[in-house]
Amino acid sequence: MERVNDASCGPSGCYTYQVSRHSTEMLHNLNQQRKNGGRFCDVLLRVGDESFPAHRAVLAACSEYFESVFSAQLGDGGAADGGPADVGGATAAPGGGAGGSRELEMHTISSKVFGDILDFAYTSRIVVRLESFPELMTAAKFLLMRSVIEICQEVIKQSNVQILVPPARADIMLFRPPGTSDLGFPLDMTNGAALAANSNGIAGSMQPEEEAARAAGAAIAGQASLPVLPGVDRLPMVAGPLSPQLLTSPFPSVASSAPPLTGKRGRGRPRKANLLDSMFGSPGGLREAGILPCGLCGKVFTDANRLRQHEAQHGVTSLQLGYIDLPPPRLGENGLPISEDPDGPRKRSRTRKQVACEICGKIFRDVYHLNRHKLSHSGEKPYSCPVCGLRFKRKDRMSYHVRSHDGSVGKPYICQSCGKGFSRPDHLNGHIKQVHTSERPHKCQTCNASFATRDRLRSHLACHEDKVPCQVCGKYLRAAYMADHLKKHSEGPSNFCSICNRGFSSASYLKVHVKTHHGVPLPQVSRHQEPILNGGAAFHCARTYGNKEGQKCSHQDPIESSDSYGDLSDASDLKTPEKQSANGSFSCDMAVPKNKMESDGEKKYPCPECGSFFRSKSYLNKHIQKVHVRALGGPLGDLGPALGSPFSPQQNMSLLESFGFQIVQSAFASSLVDPEVDQQPMGPEGK
């Protein structure tokens, strides 16, 4: 149970709560009523020798077919007075069920398959058996249970076993009145509509007006047809699976006497194919009529291009299955294939040609995204910033970066929760999902970890991959990082230090190297000398990285240099192990590029004691506290260095003024560094 915000409550002070398991518990209770003698069930479904009590509301909610049947019964006069009703192929009889409920008798479907479908309606779980899969798929299409249809399609995609299409027997009506003889030809089950011939087996193409009239009077018509659901404005071609029996017509006389598919066509509307010509005839007649069934699922197409696109979703072609030979596409005057689908001019296909990467096999919807993806394999960065020269793989990234130089990149998108600004709305949405929302819809199938965005989940999945060794250096890495690692071996270093000309594989390593080895200030100078900018020879200090036995450069003064400057770099926390050159000697070059001088010139905070410059005021305060305050005693006298306080001298003075000298002295007396200070009595001058 959780509380939700409801804007309809207003300021009246009402509360809204939502119980997420309420719907599950209701279906569970209804299922228990159905199994316990059919309590409160109002319909009895007879399948063969078995009977299944059920609730009309549940059946109508999960099946559009049952909704149409029950709606027709409510509108029928015979259903109102308790008499028998024949609604579009489903026989409803009074009595005989639990609580005097009506009965529906079903044919040509096994009780096991219908029991699985009925259990799915109450439990949302279904058992798919490969031996009865064609019958299950046919029944799901007829009942218009979209969830079961999607499950069947998913089974076809994931199963490595070739599943046979349903035979012609399964295509006949599943629900029909008792006593009605089986028809000798298959019906169209698409959208719950069935095209049936009369008792003599004669059927022809109907005009749209006749189709609408038949759909309106399907419930009261004398023909043995299924109810036509509202909203079906046309009866399509045979969309159900075709069996081998269709290849030979059971009515040769009718097939031979059928009129040919030739005639005058209107200027704007394509010709309408004859139904008998499409359903009956020899294999050659089917191809000439444009009937092209799919070899896996049995779906029928009238255009070879549509069939090829459909078979691409299965991963096979009709030629590989040996089901039917596809005719070559007809070409027009402009050289393009002509679509023979009656719906072609009115409804365009949404199927796009997908392209795959030759290196990694990733599939993209068009060539543009494929070419952009190939840049990740080549490492090419064709777009460079005209200001700083930084290169990018994509032009939009480069354009966005250029705006950062002139300050035009603002942050107009403000988070209403924390006030943080963002330059792009997608960045704001990602921030809200990640920080201010507890919902984590994307879950990992391995460790059950949940994430707010799909990108975070994709990055997390890399941790579950097994590490593989590099073929060059033998280093073990995950497959997601192996491509970037191999670039280091194939391309070599691409970022070189402008001072020592050392190469690095990435710009981040180069920045660490410059800060660590070349970002050290000069030795201390006297107050009377003019301050020297920290850039002439920034790395000439008392550090001994890279040289043997603590040796220094020959032009450095060993006397005036101070060891206290070894840790006073602007990046004092960045330390690297000792580096040696190839021949073991420490080389030094006094030539410093101009850009290095300009970057060091940005140090605009000079030390008033020694004249050294620093990039930030915090580095200057650290320098004064570590060097000048400790060396000269500072404003606190002998107590300043003894306290070892982490505060600045100004903060220490404020503490002394606030709490009094006696309190501070007694609090820090035990932490004095000099043991002689502990033994000396505090004189009056100390107070």
Curated annotation (Swiss-Prot):
<keyword id="KW-1017">Isopeptide bond</keyword>
<feature type="zinc finger region" description="C2H2-type 5">
    <location>
        <begin position="442"/>
        <end position="464"/>
    </location>
</feature>
<dbReference type="GO" id="GO:0001817">
    <property type="term" value="P:regulation of cytokine production"/>
</dbReference>
<dbReference type="GO" id="GO:0045893">
    <property type="term" value="P:positive regulation of DNA-templated transcription"/>
</dbReference>
<comment type="function">
    <text>(Microbial infection) Plays a positive role in viral cDNA synthesis.</text>
</comment>
<dbReference type="GO" id="GO:0003677">
    <property type="term" value="F:DNA binding"/>
</dbReference>
<dbReference type="GO" id="GO:0045892">
    <property type="term" value="P:negative regulation of DNA-templated transcription"/>
</dbReference>
<comment type="subunit">
    <text>Homodimer. Interacts with RNF4. Interacts (via C-terminus) with TP53; this interaction inhibits TP53 ability to activate transcription.</text>
</comment>
<protein>
    <recommendedName>
        <fullName>POZ-, AT hook-, and zinc finger-containing protein 1</fullName>
    </recommendedName>
</protein>
<keyword id="KW-0832">Ubl conjugation</keyword>
<keyword id="KW-0805">Transcription regulation</keyword>
<keyword id="KW-0597">Phosphoprotein</keyword>
<dbReference type="GO" id="GO:0001227">
    <property type="term" value="F:DNA-binding transcription repressor activity, RNA polymerase II-specific"/>
</dbReference>
<dbReference type="GO" id="GO:0003682">
    <property type="term" value="F:chromatin binding"/>
</dbReference>
<feature type="region of interest" description="Disordered">
    <location>
        <begin position="250"/>
        <end position="278"/>
    </location>
</feature>
<dbReference type="GO" id="GO:0005634">
    <property type="term" value="C:nucleus"/>
</dbReference>
<keyword id="KW-0238">DNA-binding</keyword>
<feature type="zinc finger region" description="C2H2-type 6">
    <location>
        <begin position="495"/>
        <end position="518"/>
    </location>
</feature>
<feature type="zinc finger region" description="C2H2-type 1">
    <location>
        <begin position="292"/>
        <end position="314"/>
    </location>
</feature>
<dbReference type="Pfam" id="PF00651">
    <property type="entry name" value="BTB"/>
</dbReference>
<keyword id="KW-0479">Metal-binding</keyword>
<dbReference type="Pfam" id="PF00096">
    <property type="entry name" value="zf-C2H2"/>
</dbReference>
<dbReference type="GO" id="GO:0000978">
    <property type="term" value="F:RNA polymerase II cis-regulatory region sequence-specific DNA binding"/>
</dbReference>
<keyword id="KW-0804">Transcription</keyword>
<keyword id="KW-0539">Nucleus</keyword>
<keyword id="KW-0677">Repeat</keyword>
<feature type="cross-link" description="Glycyl lysine isopeptide (Lys-Gly) (interchain with G-Cter in SUMO2)">
    <location>
        <position position="272"/>
    </location>
</feature>
<feature type="compositionally biased region" description="Basic and acidic residues">
    <location>
        <begin position="549"/>
        <end position="558"/>
    </location>
</feature>
<dbReference type="Pfam" id="PF13912">
    <property type="entry name" value="zf-C2H2_6"/>
</dbReference>
<feature type="DNA-binding region" description="A.T hook">
    <location>
        <begin position="264"/>
        <end position="276"/>
    </location>
</feature>
<keyword id="KW-0160">Chromosomal rearrangement</keyword>
<dbReference type="GO" id="GO:0008584">
    <property type="term" value="P:male gonad development"/>
</dbReference>
<keyword id="KW-0656">Proto-oncogene</keyword>
<comment type="function">
    <text>Transcriptional regulator that plays a role in many biological processes such as embryogenesis, senescence, T-cell development or neurogenesis. Interacts with the TP53 protein to control genes that are important in proliferation and in the DNA-damage response. Mechanistically, the interaction inhibits the DNA binding and transcriptional activity of TP53/p53. Part of the transcriptional network modulating regulatory T-cell development and controls the generation of the regulatory T-cell pool under homeostatic conditions.</text>
</comment>
<dbReference type="GO" id="GO:0031625">
    <property type="term" value="F:ubiquitin protein ligase binding"/>
</dbReference>
<dbReference type="GO" id="GO:0002682">
    <property type="term" value="P:regulation of immune system process"/>
</dbReference>
<feature type="cross-link" description="Glycyl lysine isopeptide (Lys-Gly) (interchain with G-Cter in SUMO2)">
    <location>
        <position position="112"/>
    </location>
</feature>
<keyword id="KW-0863">Zinc-finger</keyword>
<dbReference type="InterPro" id="IPR036236">
    <property type="entry name" value="Znf_C2H2_sf"/>
</dbReference>
<comment type="similarity">
    <text>Belongs to the krueppel C2H2-type zinc-finger protein family.</text>
</comment>
<dbReference type="InterPro" id="IPR000210">
    <property type="entry name" value="BTB/POZ_dom"/>
</dbReference>
<feature type="zinc finger region" description="C2H2-type 4">
    <location>
        <begin position="413"/>
        <end position="436"/>
    </location>
</feature>
